[in-house]
Amino acid sequence: MKILKVKYLHDYKLEVLFTNGKITTTDFEMFLTNSKNKCINKFLDKEKFKTVTVDNGFLSWNDGEMEISARSVYNDFSIDTQFANY
């Protein structure tokens, strides 16, 4: 499973489309807030967080400075899941 598309929603929430046809709403607020890693904490700046892209099926920020795998996004950050309506 890989990520096909990502769309910024608001705050630290994203809408993510996976190759399995599912769309999830994800929330990264707790992850970013609780991290003790300075490289991760800087994405608490919403303008930096909004720069998310898809790179080789991963969520990626700042040219790979922070990357999160599709499996981790799906299993650890999803708060709502539905099938895409094609």
Residue ranges and their predicted role:
Residues 1-86:
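Motif-centric detector for short Cys/His coordination patterns
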